[in-house]
Each structure stands twice: as structure tokens, then as C-alpha cells.
Amino acid sequence: MNDADVSKQIQQMVRFIRQEAEEKANEISVSAEEEFNIEKLQLVEAEKKKIRQEYERKEKQVEIRKKIEYSMQLNASRIKVLQAQDDLVSNMMEAASKEVLNVSRDHNSYKKLLKDLIVQSLLRLKEPAVLLRCRKDDHHLVESVLESAKEEYAQKLQVHPPEIIVDHHIYLPPGPGHHNAHGPSCSGGVVVASRDGKIVCENTLDARLDVVFRKKLPEIRKQLVSQVAA
């Protein structure tokens, strides 16, 4: 083999090595690019996932905030409605109290009412002797109906007429007015108690009004609610 042949073979080997190196370099470049694209895609997907999660989290926060605000507004509205109902009920009670106060101003009808209240109190207590308290202004009216009240009670229960002691030392408060605007008041009626004070029947007009009002209060509130709803 001469020098020309040797040189030719060497050149062929060099070309082969160079070609193989280029192919290998291309393979490495393609592989690296694929890995880069995969990593880039993974990073993009990871960021998208983070963004979606953050969006969902904020969306839930907004929804929760809306529910809280709605609940607060609803509660505030309910409180306003209840307050308005309470104001109406208070006004009704005040108006009824004024009407009750007018009852004692008609002496003829009030005198009969006092007798009925005394008889009713005696029937509740069923005591042979009782202590009666009334307003100072009503003292003469009470005294005028005592005997007829005792007789009516005795006839109803077929017993002896009871002893009724009218308290001349302690009277029920006077009716509401400017002189006792901030103190206790009584619109009329009587308080009857057993002699030992253990049993008490409060049969004042104010107490009767309070009992009636409490019984009617659910119905009153129901009507107020239906009016608001309408």
C-alpha cells in the first residue's frame, strides 16, 4: 500500500468519525430540545394549575364574603322589622293603658267593675278573711260595694260572707299623671290578699290588661308579620 492509498484511507476514516460526531451531536441536540420542551410544558402546566387553584380560592372567598354580607343584611333587616314590631306593640300597649285609665273616670260603670273584681278575687282566694288594697281615690267606691260583693260571693259558694279589711294605711299608687310620671302608677282595681299575706290576687286594671295583652301578643305579632309580608 502506497502513501496515496494510506492517505485516502485516513481521509475516509476522518470523514466517518466527523459524520458520526455530527450525528451524535444532532441526537444530543434533539434530545436536549425535547427534554427542554417537556420541562417547559411541565412548568407551564404547573403554573396554570397554580393560577386555577388561586382563582378557585379567590372565587370561594368572594362567594363566602357574599354569603356573609347577605346574611348580615338579612339579619339587619330582621332586626329592623322586629324593632318596628316592638315599637308598634309598645304603642298599642300605651294606647290600651290610656283607654284603661278612662274606665275609672266613669264612676257608675267603674263602681260595678270594682264590685266584680272584688268578687272575682274572693272566689280565687276562698279565704274567710282578707285584706284589700285600692287607690286612695277609689276608697269611697270600694266601701260602697263591699257588702254587696260579700253577699254575692257568699251566695255563689253557699258560705258565710267573708271579712274584708280595707287597708287605710297603704294604698295602691294613683293613676299615671304628671305628678308621678316616673313613679309607680295604678289605673284602678284592687289587690286582695289572705290575712297572712301568703296568697295575693292582683286584680288591678293594669294587671288584667297585662294578662290579656300577653295572651294576645302572639296573635298581634302574627298579624303584624302578615302585614309586613303583604
Curated annotation (Swiss-Prot):
GO molecular function: proton-transporting ATPase activity, rotational mechanism
Keyword Magnesium tagged: no
One Pfam family matching this protein: vATP-synt_E
Keywords, alphabetical: Hydrogen ion transport, Ion transport, Transport
Superkingdom per UniProt: Eukaryota
GO cellular component labels: proton-transporting two-sector ATPase complex, catalytic domain
Gene3D superfamilies: 6.10.250.1620, ATP synthase, E subunit, C-terminal
Family: Belongs to the V-ATPase E subunit family.
Function: Subunit of the peripheral V1 complex of vacuolar ATPase essential for assembly or catalytic function. V-ATPase is responsible for acidifying a variety of intracellular compartments in eukaryotic cells.
Subunit structure: V-ATPase is a heteromultimeric enzyme composed of a peripheral catalytic V1 complex (components A to H) attached to an integral membrane V0 proton pore complex (components: a, c, c', c'' and d).
HAMAP family membership: ATP_synth_E_arch
Full protein name: V-type proton ATPase subunit E
UniProt source species: Citrus limon
Species classification: Eukaryota, Viridiplantae, Streptophyta, Embryophyta, Tracheophyta
